[in-house]
């Protein structure tokens, strides 16, 4: 009404709209404009205005390792798998992020759930599910079936969690990761439409995770979200330098409990669409072409597994064999799916078999980062 009242006595009317896209929203003319175009008998002229911009071709420059860069490198004593993968895929990106210390902004839009926040919510929900809804010791197929059927905690009345449901822990995860509430809080602002859809997807993924674990039950979850580190010695200008590498393990579990097949798995949850394929060799984990096309998480999974197999008496006191596992929840529907990594089509049942080759490649990369004669070059 107000729109038509506004234009009813006008002799010349100009409407403008922006057709550019912003995020997931596309610019388009309003329904009022579409109505005028189809119903009016007056002449309508359509013009398209374009900004005469020409993109400038900019070539990234090589950064030489001068005295200031080498001093900064000498100060760095900890190298995460993410940092190492960044160097492998783009040396210049590594320089800007870890030497020049130029960071990306880390803003959370509570009206949106991007891939990073979605992954954080799923990680937290999975951790809470195993801590509050399933037995703390050995988890059987029967326990998992009960949770899948009822959605209710299988823990004892004395645990304090007997009344919790799967919906409760998902709400707690949203409150914690999206709305920055304290752990244990389930109350949060009302979810919008997109957030409600993501909530249903999280629940679906948790059901998928339970069905995957049922195949290897009985199992025991040893820990969630805990840090691991390993010391390394590298050569820099002929001298030894002591550094550390490591990170945080999403989940460490023991499968085939109380059998001769018992072993530990370092499980890394992945909610994205990229999937890790079978490796031909350890060298492929450090190949930028493999990291770009397939998965850049294999080296991280191998490193964490080696730490658990050789350097973690707290979580692996019995020195069980350890397998690296990348659990891509989107691709885990088939009955023969296994998250355990493979090399040359052979499933890795004991990561220490590949320890020598892995540490050799890892050391080579770290020494290359410190080599003053090798500049930081952009990806070709």
Where is each model-derived feature located?
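Generic recognition of stable, solvent-exposed alpha-helical segments in well-folded globular domains
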Residues: 1-8, 24-31, 79-82, 86-94, ...
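C-terminal, charged and often intrinsically disordered regions of DNA end-processing helicases
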Residues: 30-132, 242, 370, 374-380
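A non-catalytic, helix-rich entry segment at domain boundaries
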Residues: 125-232, 341-349, 353
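Glycine- and acidic
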Residues: 69, 73-83, 101-112, 134, ...
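Active-site-adjacent bridging/hinge elements
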Residues: 92-104, 170, 174-175, 263-283, ...
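Non-catalytic protein-protein interaction segments used by genome-maintenance enzymes to assemble
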Residues: 223-312
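Metal-dependent nuclease catalytic regions and adjoining charged, substrate-binding loops involved
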Residues: 19-21, 29, 36-57, 293-294, ...
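Conserved C-terminal motor-coupling region of P-loop helicases
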Residues: 1-46, 271-273, 277-292
């Amino acid at each position: 009404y107000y729109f038509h009242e506004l234009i009813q006595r006008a002799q010349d009317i100009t409407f403008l709209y922006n057709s550019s896209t912003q995020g997931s929203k596309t610019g388009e003319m309003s329904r009022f404009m579409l109505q005028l175009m189809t119903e009016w008998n007056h002449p309508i002229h359509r013009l398209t205005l374009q900004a005469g911009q020409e993109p400038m071709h900019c070539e990234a420059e090589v950064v030489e390792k001068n005295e200031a860069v080498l001093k900064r490198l000498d100060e760095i004593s900890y190298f995460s798998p993410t940092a190492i993968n960044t160097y492998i895929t783009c040396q210049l990106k590594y320089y800007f992020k870890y030497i020049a210390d130029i960071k990306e902004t880390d803003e959370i839009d509570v009206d949106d759930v991007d891939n990073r926040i979605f992954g954080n919510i799923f990680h937290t929900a999975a951790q809470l599910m195993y801590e509050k809804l399933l037995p703390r010791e050995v988890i059987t197929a029967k326990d998992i079936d009960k949770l899948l059927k009822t959605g209710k905690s299988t823990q004892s009345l004395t645990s304090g969690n007997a009344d919790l449901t799967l919906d409760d822990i998902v709400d707690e995860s949203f409150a914690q990761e999206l709305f920055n509430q304290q752990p244990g809080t389930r109350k949060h602002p009302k979810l919008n439409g997109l957030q409600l859809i993501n909530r249903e997807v999280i629940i679906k993924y948790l059901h998928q995770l339970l069905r995957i674990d049922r195949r290897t039950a009985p199992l025991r979850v040893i820990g969630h979200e805990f840090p691991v580190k390993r010391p390394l010695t590298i050569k820099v200008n002929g001298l030894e330098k002591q550094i550390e590498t490591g990170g945080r393990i999403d989940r460490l579990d023991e499968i085939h409990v109380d059998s001769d097949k018992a072993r530990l798995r370092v499980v890394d949850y992945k909610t994205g669409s990229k999937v890790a394929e079978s490796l031909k060799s350890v060298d492929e984990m450090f190949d930028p072409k493999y990291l770009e096309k397939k998965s850049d998480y294999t080296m991280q999974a191998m490193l964490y597994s080696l730490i658990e197999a050789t350097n973690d008496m707290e979580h692996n006191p019995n020195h069980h064999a350890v397998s690296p596992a990348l659990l891509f929840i989107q691709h885990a529907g088939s009955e023969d799916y296994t998250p355990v990594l493979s090399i040359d089509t052979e499933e890795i049942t004991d990561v220490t078999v590949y320890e020598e080759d892995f540490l050799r490649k890892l050391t080579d990369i770290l020494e290359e980062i410190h080599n003053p004669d090798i500049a930081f070059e952009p990806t070709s």
